[in-house]
Amino acid sequence: LVDAGVSDKKELMSNPKFAELLKGFGVEPPLKISTTTDKETFAFAKSDEGFKALLNHDNEKVQSLVAARLGTKSTLEETRTQRFIDIARRGLLPVPVRYYAAHTGRWGGDDKINLQNLPSRGPNGKKLKSSIVAPEGYSLIDCDSSQIEARVLAWLAGQDDLTNAFAKGDDVYKHMASSIYNVPSDGVSKDQRFVGKTTILGAGYGMGAPKFQAQLQTFGFDMELDEARRIIDIYRSTNGAISQLWRDANNMVQYMARGDSVQFGKDGVLQVDARKNAIMLPSGLPMFYHGLAAEKSDRGYEYTYRTRKGPNRIYGGKVVENVCQAIARCIIGHQMILLAKKYKAVLTVHDSIITCVRDEELDEAQAYMEECMSQTPDWAEGLPITCESGTGKSYGECE
């Protein structure tokens, strides 16, 4: 580390500085397409294949540098573990939650206890989750809304064949793989189904071939760019209504910026209030794009809106993603209200709700919870909702 010029851990934690350290040893930093910005960024996550490969680099100094970076990052996990230990000494685990943490209204962690991103992979995998246990005589139920964003997307776009497949309980990942590889659904291999799953869950918001290729690589699945491009083309041609929704949303951004109020989505279910720069969701929740403005660029006009972190670019696919996540959030909230008639939610993580019940009520409570989380709100008629649940004495056992 001294040879590399590392003086403190800040140089290891900073992506640009760490990239310069690698270049000092003649190593080009691995890159990926950011799923947040759609731009090229450093692939320095411990799950990134290019980064993991550096642990076996021919130069031992590069190996040491990468190991030190991973060790520094692991201190964050150590800090959270210590926080759990300190809380356990005081009694029960509080679950502080920010009610509207993201632009789409998703809940978020607070008070230095972020239960939204507990690790589930790696050497310490589920240890933190398994440390969250029910009191004596109680059990936990973890119920997850299955594929909720993909279902919302199909319903919102009026992609009726996909919506009907979800409603019938078909394996839509196999169906997608069947179209991609031109094989019968019952002949789809495990790897082919994985590609079908990644396509259904990833390509629905306008993802391009380079980003799709990069996403597969993060799972250790190598694919040529031409093949990734072929798969994206098949997804878009197979799901024409979804592709049209992106275009409609892109036009909507332009209309909103001009001050024109319009409708889009299935049967005009999304109402645009241009005076407030807001999209009114069918649940009644407004989603704002404050300070929406057009900027001239080499590619024409680009649109941005104001956030606490500065201007954020917005376009058709991103609008659709925002709307689907916000609608999914509203559905989870609706389900929590139904559940609260009999049982209290003790935690919500992404698309799942966790409750704590007496052991003698476990089967009844699990059945009631699945019933609540399979109900579609009145404002989302025709949207097929389903769920999966697990039980255990600890949060980790529920999965």
Across the structure, where does each feature detected by a protein language model lie?
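Polymerase palm active-site segment centered on the conserved acidic dipeptide of motif C
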Residues: 1-11, 227, 231-258, 360-399
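Acidic, glycine-rich two-metal-ion catalytic cores of nucleic acid-processing enzymes
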Residues: 8-187, 245-352, 359-360, 366-372
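A general structural motif at alpha-helix termini
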Residues: 16, 22, 216, 232-235
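Catalytic palm subdomain of template-directed nucleic-acid polymerases
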Residues: 153, 211-223, 236, 240, ...
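Short, positively charged loop/turn segments that connect secondary-structure elements
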Residues: 185, 221-231
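Alpha-helical scaffolds flanking conserved acidic
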Residues: 189-199, 343-344
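Extended amphipathic alpha-helical segments enriched in small hydrophobics
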Residues: 199-216
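Helix-rich, typically C-terminal accessory recognition domains appended to large enzymatic cores
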Residues: 211-212, 332-333, 387
